[in-house]
């Protein structure tokens, strides 16, 4: 089980004072929620993944997240909002951001001796997937991410956006046509012992319908928000719909947790318990009821769990021992 937060402290063009207050709230509340959660099968607390926007970098906003990472209850990965992008600009931005996260804050993980990162695309427009080309502009983004050391993309699902790919409820490999946008629209499902089967690994969240308490079905896509908080019924649907590799279930949830309304729903307020605290309890109880062994995971640990099933994976390597990530100065 992983939570991938499109974590945007400066989202909505707020002041630095507001952004600092947003981050401080998480630094105060999240450690207590993680500590109170049921331990998983390995005795671990939940580990929250903050996908932080490259364009919002401020050292004073990142350092509290780095502190939670050092405590073992958080991790920081890469997020970006861009438009009319070029390959050269993208390499410079991602490479520079990764170096800054590592050199200034000790963040990002190493895999096979190379620094790697997980990725979420802002405004959902991964690989220039919006029909009119907005919010990206970079066809071939999948291949660049692969070569820069991205171990997996966590953007999907994106309904009702037209950027949504055709493949749902799978952990899969992109196999789109080079030179054409939306390479993740085609792919091969990750399988036990299958190894690398495409350009980039896609770890997607649950997609389906839910009916309880509704006259008209609602689309379920694993988002936790103020207008769609966790419920016991939703937890059951997540486990029904989540991607599988063999008998293992990979449940990826997402949110925009820096926003005040969503932070209220996730962390709680002075008058109410937050949705995360209840969600962890429901997940633990329902998993036990279904005889499922729970593992709380960061985005990176989710990737390593996939690798344990598929066999060795080599993010940042184009089928050769030379780390292609070095084109951006990423080591």
Model-found features: residue ranges?
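C-terminal domain-boundary segment and adjacent tail
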Residues: 147, 152-166, 223-331
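Structural preference for beta-strand elements that scaffold enzyme active sites
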Residues: 2-4, 43-49, 73-77, 116-118, ...
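Short, solvent-exposed loop/turn segments at secondary-structure junctions
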Residues: 7-10, 53-57, 81-83, 124-127, ...
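Metal-dependent polysaccharide deacetylase catalytic core of the NodB/CE4 family, i.e.
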Residues: 49-132, 155-156, 253-255, 298
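Active-site-adjacent pocket scaffolds in enzyme catalytic domains
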Residues: 106-251
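The substrate-binding groove and active-site-proximal loops of carbohydrate-active enzymes
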Residues: 11-24, 46-55, 81-88, 122-135, ...
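Well-ordered, non-membrane alpha-helical segments in soluble/globular domains
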Residues: 16-36, 60-62, 90-101, 134-144, ...
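Active-site beta->alpha N-cap acidic-glycine motif
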Residues: 1-74, 82-84, 115-123, 143, ...
